[in-house]
């Protein structure tokens, strides 16, 4: 052994990097023995054996000899470890459960198997950070070590535990392996493809050769190792030292550590990989693959021995602590046969900075923190990671984490230097790859075949991807998605091991696990929520921030971990927002149900195309359509889409969205916990656990106590809101606010609507996003406080949390709330839970409000105050289920029964609307709570889901997609709520309206909006005292009806109302009182009654069947407004809600009808087209004024837009009173609808919009004549009610009128000013701007808001001022993108200009408003003449070109080539000024040749159907390529234009003069007289011709060349245009045009560069998060 170790030491010295990394991994694995393993003797080996490495160490002599022989042969042959990587194990080593060595190293396999079977069955990857090596092949070879670092991060718990206990790392590693082991067991038995096991592809026989066999590598570990290391190198550079050891890939430090060959591979392979990488930035996929194969668990025997000996030898040099982080790598490899090699590979990637994202994903619950600390890429996470790592771990895990961070530095110092050369690169890739494969496989429900295929495909594809971009690029992101999802499970398992090893940790996390275990079964049951979770994870993984946002509770980097911790006690998530989430969730998800869920979720995660991004979210972040629901809302998009379908049927909407969430409340909540567990793992635990507060505090250790408290209470709501996946932050905020009040969470003071409140350890951006003024609103008193919890994108997971906390909190906060709240918690609808919490929170804020609110809810029949409070409570609960829930309490059904019934009611909610009407008191509560929920939770529970996801997306860059989807869902929720409200409208409306008004009255700020939600009940009680109540009710109506759908809108209303609240409320009251119940009833009836105006196909408003009943109920409520103030509020609410529903439905119908996704068909209820014409234009304008003012200007409209988006028709006004007063909102949602609902009203669909608009215009023109008369009468009789119709809040319309009259000019000015200053816009735009003047401004603002619609919705709900400010901040950029929606809104708002335009579809105005840069207004690019900079461009181009040459994944290769092309273009552009014309011409020609070569890569895909996502992405790349070719050809022509002119002039003269001899048989040739004899015979046969001089011939040739360039430029451009149309990629191009300015034949090379880079980034995000893309 000693000799062996020495030999290995020598080998390691040769490949010191790999060796050191391996040693570090081993040492880390054996952290228990902190002593430097200078002893190279069996003692150390035994120690390693005792630890996870004992198995490797206790290799039989036969195995050792074989390994030595292998190493000898490799050394002789110069075979690098890379080659040996081919085979994971020198020989397919079978690890029997009774294997003594394995037992010694990993502990009893039975125990491990218990974890694997029970907790990690679906999870093959144990290293969350390690797992997407193929995503990270792009990263430099060093990345391997870093890639390993993420693996270490995932195994961070191991290192941490190692520090604390040697057993812990072993167990952790075992745990991680358990995740893979189940797969390993299966695949070991069933299929070799598992990627590593025996040496299927690369048996002991020369790992080199088998390494490339692709068995495991195809999966991605081998390529991953190389790629992964690159991608994570940056991240792991810091953590490589500690992390690599700590990575699950203990042996994999050398990538193939597990195999006997791996050890030797450590030395040479890394260099080989590095060389193959060609500079290390882009590791060749093949090289990575080989390591991956070699690193597969099967080879651990020899590799382990080698590693052990190397560790003994090398470790003596390096402190044990450095190696301590590697403890569980061997075990992981041994057990995770399917993708253990990935972990191995990942394990050794100490210096893989690019794995910032992968690291997050890979980091285990505990280990992630260390990677955070060590990984620079996760800078945002790092602060939290370091500070929060302990906290996040919920205490005990924290200690190991803290230990781990110190260890990574050592590892970084000792291991990082050597590691980067080879192990870093290889191992990092492996770890990432492993994660990816494991994640994918696990998500695939451990279907070995699918796993193998996915792993192979993924290893090939992802490793390529990873080479393309560091950890966050397309491959890496895609991998990250999986990693996130997988890692949650993996982390869970790992975390569980740690917990078992560490008593206290065990207890805390066991509880979490138990809590999560409960949800996990549900998770498997609820596929929808899983989808959300996966989507969120996918979105989050796009970027670290996105990861944090989507996964981490506090998502934005530092906040992400804190938030995650709050949500989930597990701190591992802290490292990577996603990872933490997944870590926290992992405890919950660890149960077998979770695994199955994860598997399913993984599929859903990948299958649902598109982020967002934005994605990333990735809000996202995704993708990076910031506002798009798909990118940001991608998390929710699956549900959103479902919800959309549900929206079609109000009943179904309630059911699908609400029922999904309520009906599946437990399942969904748990599911979402499980699902988002990957991202929100921690949060779900806290939420799920009744001891959430304690857990939250532990998890939120890094977060301020206030935040933690809030998170605990808020986490429940926030979790649910987050769970919806829509702007987790916004939704979370909303939830948080309620939770805060209810749970007693502290509220952090908020500077102001435009300001960013600062939370300790929380990034400003997150804080801004959170913008929890609405949350504070719930907590009416602290209007300037913000709840930190909302920051979570994790909230997806929090759903579960919310559910349980809701029950707890609801019961605890207010027994009164118990009946409704408990019922609601059972529904587990995020919205409901949130509502319940909201109400509770309000009571917390206002004990009287809450206690009275809920009880009054029960006492609803009581006075208006009771109704109002009940309404507020109901508002909180108001998701479709809320209504049911409210009824349930009346029915006195048990909570369990309530849940079941609620689920049933969710589906029946539409029809049940009548029941609420009958039980007006309870329904009122439901109805009112509905609004509060939306305000508090950003949306209702179902809305919340879509809203949160959409919002995060909105934050990213796919605002339109996200927003659309969110809005659709919101609309669904809204419609359902409205319907329910309608049914319960008598008192529900009163309660909701009055409570809203009260809330507004008590809190003028946006927070009042929340207050209205939560304290709306109390306000309802206060209703009589507050005359502001009308306005407040207006806000509340927005909150209840619209806020459910669009929490942002409600918040905005409140915020807006704050300044104008008194005035608005007074006007509202005046309006409401003047409005007779008759008018309201008639209006509502017209809107909702198919027999009346509503169903005359005027507005295409889809009305649920229940709506009629609800209308009646609303009418009844309007007719029976008990309190003096409440009656007006109730009528306003009634009208608003019914109106809102029609408007929303209209927009849904219109927005969805035009696109393929038409909610109308789904809607079982009538399709009623409501015309804004019904509402007087003046009123609309007034409503705009008032609504925006009360709703924080356009921000609220934007939030409302999400809800009102579906109500583009004139009824936006009517509906808006309850749902959303702002017409802008109806328009805003259109962009969101555009993304979510195929952008019916989006500018992209201008034609559709115009057609719809024309149709609606014709219908509405006819209807408007009638409606105008009616509305005029109503205005005279009931100005407030109708205004309410106009605006979300009925009381806002009078105020708007005043504002319009007083500040018409001011508002225009302010609007203009506000546009630049988005933050100001929300509060003042609508208030100050006159209707028409403000319409234009509103359009722009709406466009901005649309872009930030998702954020706005969530934000508005969470904190109207802050969120709106945040939303508005994005607004200025989005205008171009969201112009169409804004236009639609504007059209709606500009009802006076054209009745038709008043409907949601008002493209004409927006069309004129579409903002494009003028050709003469272009920013003049003054490229630097600095040669150094030009050389930098050239170097970047060359690097990408070489990386693309080595890339194996077709998409990654093509994108890398295209990136190289644009860099070459920048170089050529610079050469135009610095170099000769010929050199420049040559550069362009060469570039054109290169891009033509690239185009050959697209052809196979272009000719195939574009239904395939891969083909679509290739087609989009082809479009960008054709554009580049066209512009290059044009540039080549322009460069020679002077020559061309001279040639043309010369040729013109030549042809004009007719010079030239006629050559024919009769004329001897003067040129060749000697040939005359020979030519005489045939001369007569030659046709007459003209003899031209050589000069003329040359000129003709040159002219042909130059003009061919010109012709090609136009031809290629036309080809691109055709491909855009035939491939249906218009939205993609339009989005790029809006974001980067249109690409034209006049574009400069710098503009081409920006445009193409943006397009490639979007495509990578889409590939990383296919769910976003698909949607």
From Swiss-Prot:
Superkingdom field: Eukaryota
Compositionally biased region (Low complexity): 145-179, 210-242, 459-479, 497-522, 561-587, 723-755, 858-896, 947-963, 988-1002, 1032-1058, 1562-1581
Start-end of Pro residues biased regions: 1120-1130
Residues bearing the modification Phosphoserine: 446, 448, 819-820, 869, 871, 1360
Keyword field: Developmental protein, DNA-binding, Nucleus, Pair-rule protein, Phosphoprotein, Transcription, Transcription regulation
DNA-binding region: 849-861
Biased composition (Basic and acidic residues): 70-79, 424-437, 1063-1080, 1224-1241, 1250-1280
UniProt-listed InterPro entries: AF4/FMR2 (IPR007797), AF4/FMR2_CHD (IPR043640)
Acidic residues bias locations: 439-450
Single GO molecular function: DNA binding
Gene Ontology biological process terms from the UniProt entry: learning or memory; neuronal stem cell population maintenance; periodic partitioning by pair rule gene; positive regulation of transcription by RNA polymerase II; regulation of cytoskeleton organization; regulation of DNA-templated transcription; regulation of lipid transport; wing disc dorsal/ventral pattern formation
Pfam families reported for this sequence: AFF4_CHD (PF18876)
Main location: nucleus
Modified sites of kind Phosphothreonine: 416, 1362
Region (Disordered): 53-79, 126-304, 393-599, 723-761, 774-1162, 1185-1311, 1562-1586
Polar residues composition-biased segments: 588-599, 774-786, 907-917, 1009-1020, 1188-1203
Compartments reported by the entry: Nucleus
Function: Has a role in transcriptional regulation. Acts in parallel with the Ras/MAPK and the PI3K/PKB pathways in the control of cell identity and cellular growth. Essential for regulation of the cytoskeleton and cell growth but not for cell proliferation or growth rate. Required specifically for the microtubule-based basal transport of lipid droplets. Plays a partially redundant function downstream of Raf in cell fate specification in the developing eye. Pair-rule protein that regulates embryonic cellularization, gastrulation and segmentation.
Family stated for the protein in its record: Belongs to the AF4 family.
Designated name of the protein: AF4/FMR2 family member lilli
Provenance organism: Drosophila yakuba
């Amino acid at each position: 052994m000693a000799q062996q170790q020495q030999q290995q030491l020598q080998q390691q010295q040769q490949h010191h990097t790999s060796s050191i990394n391996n040693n570090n991994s081993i040492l880390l694995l054996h952290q228990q023995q902190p002593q430097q393993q200078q002893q190279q003797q069996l003692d150390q080996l035994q120690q390693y054996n005792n630890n996870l490495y004992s198995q490797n160490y206790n290799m039989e002599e036969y195995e050792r000899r074989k390994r030595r022989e292998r190493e000898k042969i490799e050394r002789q042959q110069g075979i690098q470890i890379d080659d040996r990587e081919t085979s994971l194990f020198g020989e397919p080593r079978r690890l029997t459960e009774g294997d003594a060595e394995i037992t010694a190293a990993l502990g009893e396999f039975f125990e491990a198997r218990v974890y694997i079977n029970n907790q990690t069955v679906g999870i093959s990857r144990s290293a969350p950070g390690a797992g997407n090596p193929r995503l990270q092949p792009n990263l430099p070879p060093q990345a391997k070590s870093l890639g390993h670092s993420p693996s270490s991060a995932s195994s961070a718990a191991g290192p941490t535990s190692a520090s604390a206990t040697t057993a812990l790392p072993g167990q952790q590693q075992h745990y991680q392996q358990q995740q893979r082991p189940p797969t390993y067991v299966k695949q070991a038995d069933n299929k070799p493809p598992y990627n590593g096991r025996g040496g299927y592809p690369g048996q002991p026989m020369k790992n080199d050769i088998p390494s490339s066999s692709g068995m495991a590598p195809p999966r991605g570990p081998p390529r991953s190792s190389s790629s992964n290391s690159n991608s994570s190198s940056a991240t792991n550079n810091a953590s490589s030292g500690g992390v690599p050891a700590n990575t699950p890939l203990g042996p994999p430090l050398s990538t193939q550590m597990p195999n006997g060959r791996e050890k030797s591979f450590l030395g040479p392979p890394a260099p080989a990989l590095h060389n193959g990488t060609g500079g290390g930035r882009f590791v060749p996929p093949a090289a990575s693959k080989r390591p991956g194969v070699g690193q597969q668990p099967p080879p651990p025997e020899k590799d382990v021995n080698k590693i052990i000996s190397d560790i003994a030898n090398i470790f003596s040099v390096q402190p044990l602590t450095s190696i301590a982080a590697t403890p569980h790598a061997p075990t992981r490899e041994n057990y995770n046969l399917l993708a253990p090699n990935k972990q191995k590979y990942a394990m050794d990637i100490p210096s893989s900075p690019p794995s910032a994202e992968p690291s997050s994903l890979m980091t285990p619950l505990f280990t992630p923190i260390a990677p955070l600390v060590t990984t620079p890429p996760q800078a945002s996470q790092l602060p939290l990671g370091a500070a929060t790592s302990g906290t996040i771990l919920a205490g005990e895990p924290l200690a190991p984490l803290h230990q781990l961070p110190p260890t990574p530095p050592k590892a970084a110092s000792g291991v990082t230097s050597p590691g980067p050369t080879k192990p870093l690169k290889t191992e990092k890739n492996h770890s990432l790859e492993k994660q990816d494969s494991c994640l994918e496989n696990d998500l695939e429900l451990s279907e070995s075949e699918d796993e193998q295929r996915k792993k192979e495909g993924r290893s090939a594809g992802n490793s390529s991807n990873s080479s393309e971009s560091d950890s966050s690029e397309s491959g890496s992101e895609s991998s990250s998605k999986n990693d996130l999802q997988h890692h949650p499970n993996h982390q869970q398992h790992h975390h569980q091991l740690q917990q078992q090893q560490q008593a206290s940790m065990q207890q805390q996390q066991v509880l979490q696990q138990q809590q999560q275990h409960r949800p996990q079964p549900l998770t498997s049951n609820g596929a929808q929520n899983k989808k959300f979770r996966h989507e969120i994870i996918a979105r989050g993984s796009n970027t670290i921030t996105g990861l944090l946002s989507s996964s981490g509770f506090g998502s934005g980097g530092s906040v992400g971990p804190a938030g995650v911790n709050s949500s989930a006690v597990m701190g591992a998530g802290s490292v990577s927002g996603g990872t933490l989430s997944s870590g926290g969730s992992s405890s919950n998800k660890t149960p077998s149900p979770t695994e199955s869920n994860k598997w399913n979720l993984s599929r859903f995660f990948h299958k649902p195309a598109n982020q967002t991004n934005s994605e990333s979210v990735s809000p996202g972040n995704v993708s990076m359509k910031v506002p798009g629901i798909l990118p940001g809302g991608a998390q929710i998009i699956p549900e959103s889409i479902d919800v959309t379908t549900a929206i079609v049927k109000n009943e179904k909407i309630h059911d699908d969205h609400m029922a999904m969430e309520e009906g599946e409340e437990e399942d969904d909540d748990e599911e979402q916990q499980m699902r988002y567990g990957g991202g929100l793992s921690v949060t779900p635990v806290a939420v799920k656990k009744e001891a959430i507060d304690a857990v939250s505090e532990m998890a939120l250790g890094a977060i301020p106590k206030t935040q933690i408290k809030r998170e605990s209470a808020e986490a429940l709501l926030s979790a649910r809101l987050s769970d919806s996946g829509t702007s987790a932050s916004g939704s979370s905020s909303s939830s948080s606010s309620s939770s805060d009040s209810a749970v007693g969470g502290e509220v952090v003071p908020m500077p102001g609507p435009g300001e960013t409140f600062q939370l300790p350890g929380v990034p400003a951006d997150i804080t801004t996003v959170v913008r929890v003024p609405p949350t504070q609103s719930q907590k009416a008193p602290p209007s300037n406080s913000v709840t930190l919890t909302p920051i979570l994108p994790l909230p997806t997971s929090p759903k579960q949390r919310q559910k349980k906390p809701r029950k707890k909190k609801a019961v605890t906060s207010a027994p009164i709330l118990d009946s409704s709240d408990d019922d609601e918690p059972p529904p587990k609808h995020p919205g409901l839970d949130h509502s319940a919490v909201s109400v509770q929170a309000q009571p917390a804020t206002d004990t009287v409000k809450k206690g009275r609110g809920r009880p009054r809810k029960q006492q609803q029949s009581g006075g208006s105050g009771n109704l109002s409070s009940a309404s507020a409570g109901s508002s909180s609960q108001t998701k479709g289920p809320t209504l049911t829930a409210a009824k349930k309490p009346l029915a006195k059904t048990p909570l369990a029964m309530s849940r079941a019934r609620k689920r049933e009611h969710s589906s029946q909610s539409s029809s049940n609307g009548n029941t609420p009407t009958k039980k007006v008191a309870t329904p009122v509560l439901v109805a009112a709570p509905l609004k509060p929920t939306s305000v508090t939770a950003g949306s209702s529970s179902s809305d919340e889901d879509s809203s949160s996801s959409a919002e995060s997306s909105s934050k990213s860059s796919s605002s339109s997609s996200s927003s659309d989807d969110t809005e659709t869902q919101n609309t669904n929720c809204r419609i359902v709520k409205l319907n329910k409200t309608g049914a319960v409208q008598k008192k529900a409306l009163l309660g909701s309206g009055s409570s809203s008004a009260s809330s507004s009255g008590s809190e003028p700020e946006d927070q009042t909006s929340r207050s209205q939600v939560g304290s709306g009940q109390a306000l309802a009680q206060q209703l009589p005292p507050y005359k502001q109540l009308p306005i407040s009710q207006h806000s509340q109506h927005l909150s209840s009806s619209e806020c459910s759908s669009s929490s942002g809108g409600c918040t905005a209303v409140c915020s807006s109302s704050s300044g104008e609240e008194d005035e608005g409320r007074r006007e509202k009251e005046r309006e409401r009182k003047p409005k007779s119940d008759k008018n309201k009833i008639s209006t509502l009836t017209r809107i909702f009654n198919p027999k009346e105006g509503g169903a005359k196909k005027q507005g295409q408003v889809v009305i649920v069947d229940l709506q009629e009943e609800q209308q009646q109920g609303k009418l009844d409520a309007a007719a029976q407004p008990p309190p003096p103030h409440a009656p007006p509020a109730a009528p306003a609410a009634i009208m608003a809600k019914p109106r809102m529903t029609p408007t929303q439905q209209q927009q849904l119908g219109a927005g969805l009808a035009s696109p393929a996704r038409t909610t109308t068909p789904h809607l079982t209820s009538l399709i009623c087209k409501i015309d804004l014409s019904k509402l007087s234009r003046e009123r609309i304008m007034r409503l705009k004024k008032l609504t925006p003012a009360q709703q924080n200007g356009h921000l609220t409209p934007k939030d409302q837009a999400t809800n009102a988006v579906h109500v583009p028709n004139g009824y936006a006004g009517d509906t808006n009173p309850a749902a959303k007063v702002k017409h802008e909102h109806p328009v805003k949602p259109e962009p969101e609808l555009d993304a979510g609902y195929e952008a019916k009203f989006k500018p992209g669909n201008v034609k559709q919009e115009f057609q719809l608009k024309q149709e609606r215009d014709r219908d509405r023109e006819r209807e408007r004549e009638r409606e105008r008369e009616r509305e005029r009468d109503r205005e005279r009789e009931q100005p407030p009610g109708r205004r309410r119709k106009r605006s979300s809040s009925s009381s806002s319309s009078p105020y708007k009128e005043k504002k319009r009259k007083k500040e018409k000019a001011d508002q225009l000015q302010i609007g203009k000013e506000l546009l630049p200053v988005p933050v100001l816009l929300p509060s003042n735009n609508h208030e100050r701007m006159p209707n028409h003047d403000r319409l234009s401004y509103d359009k722009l603002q709406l466009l901005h808001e649309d872009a930030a619609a998702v954020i706005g919705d969530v934000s508005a709900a969470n904190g109207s001022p802050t969120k709106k400010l945040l939303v508005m901040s994005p607004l200025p950029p989005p205008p171009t993108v969201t112009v169409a929606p804004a236009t639609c809104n504007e059209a709606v708002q500009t009802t006076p200009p054209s009745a038709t335009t008043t409907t949601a579809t008002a493209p004409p105005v927006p069309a004129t408003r579409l903002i494009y840069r003028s050709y003469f207004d272009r920013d003049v690019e003054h490229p630097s003449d600095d040669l150094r900079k030009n050389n930098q461009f050239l170097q970047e181009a060359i690097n990408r070109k070489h990386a693309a040459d080595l890339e194996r994944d077709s998409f990654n290769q093509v994108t890398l080539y295209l990136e190289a092309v644009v860099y070459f273009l920048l170089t050529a552009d610079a050469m135009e000024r610095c170099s000769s014309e010929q050199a420049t011409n040559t550069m362009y020609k060469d570039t054109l040749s290169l891009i033509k070569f690239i185009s050959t890569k697209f052809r196979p895909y272009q000719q195939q159907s574009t239904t395939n996502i891969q083909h679509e992405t290739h087609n989009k790349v082809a479009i960008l390529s054709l554009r580049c070719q066209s512009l290059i050809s044009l540039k080549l022509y322009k460069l020679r234009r002077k020559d061309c002119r001279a040639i043309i002039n010369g040729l013109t003269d030549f042809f004009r003069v007719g010079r030239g001899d006629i050559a024919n048989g009769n004329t001897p040739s003067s040129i060749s007289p000697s040939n005359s004899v020979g030519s005489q015979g045939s001369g007569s046969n030659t046709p007459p011709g003209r003899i031209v001089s050589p000069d003329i011939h040359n000129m003709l040739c040159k002219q042909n060349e130059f003009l061919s360039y010109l012709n090609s430029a136009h031809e290629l451009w036309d080809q691109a245009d055709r491909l855009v149309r035939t491939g249906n990629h218009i939205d993609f191009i339009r989005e790029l045009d809006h974001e980067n300015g249109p690409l034209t034949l006049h574009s400069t090379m710098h503009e081409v560069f920006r445009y193409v880079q943006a397009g490639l980034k979007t495509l990578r995000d889409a590939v990383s998060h296919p769910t976003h893309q698909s949607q």
